[in-house]
Amino acid sequence: MELLQYTFFQHALIGSLLASIACGLIGTYIVTRRLVFISGGLTHASFGGIGLGLYTGISPILSAALFAVLSAFGVEWLSKRKDMREDSAIAVFWTLGMALGIMFTFLSPGFAPDLSAYLFGNILTITWSDIALLGGLALLLILFFAMYLHPIIYVAFDREFARSQGIPVQVFEYVLMMFIALTIVACLRMVGIVLVISLLTVPQMTDNLFSHRFHRIIWLSIGIGYLSCLGGLMISFYLNVPSGASIIFFSIIIYAICKTGKSFWLYLQR
């Protein structure tokens, strides 16, 4: 294909694969543990780090990662307190991150920075440094899940049972929250703050239509996630629309087709 001759498209293909691996792994934990709302809160909280990076002149991705991880730990800690509900803790960091992001952005010296790359993403503009970040994260997640798959499953499905088996539940929860935060930040350049949560949940929702086994959902999520990225890339390139939106749109089309197909199949089995 002619597209494969372009360096930016090669970068997009590699980045899509690495992002699909990372999102397939940690996204399965998110959906199984029902942490979608928390992940959405961390996504918007990371905007505070982006604003801080633009204001101080450091890498916005680096500051967003630091802000997201600290917010993840803060949500995890506050949600365990008896005087604070989990949704309230999420709201605190969600709104704090957005407020700080807006303030720091307006205080940034010089011309007003272009935030569209962080809000909506553009996978066609990712660089080797973005690919290296995604690759390092994907490798860490592969190693962590390979070494501790069963404890992760226990923590995801039944915290009390995991604790009865001697598993340090709180340690795993904090580590996995850190990985959620880092995955969100690593994918910002691809689909942006507005849509990154869909990349972590829609493929898993599609897989849940056909399987409830944790490891099978991981593999299917990686495949569907990558297929969504490829389809979204084609739509983005030929229609000249934002790649982040087209990737999520294509993934939801896949979900709708699978959902309709399964419903029709079950209807025929009556």
PLM feature spans:
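Cytosolic-side transmembrane-helix boundaries in multi-pass membrane proteins
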Residues: 241-248, 252-270
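Transmembrane alpha-helical segments in multi-pass inner-membrane proteins
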Residues: 190, 194-245
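Membrane-interfacial amphipathic/re-entrant helices at transmembrane-helix boundaries
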Residues: 1-21, 269
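Helix-loop-helix "hairpin" substructures at the membrane interface of multi-pass membrane proteins
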Residues: 130-203
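Transmembrane helix-bundle core of multi-pass membrane transporters
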Residues: 6-11, 82, 90-150
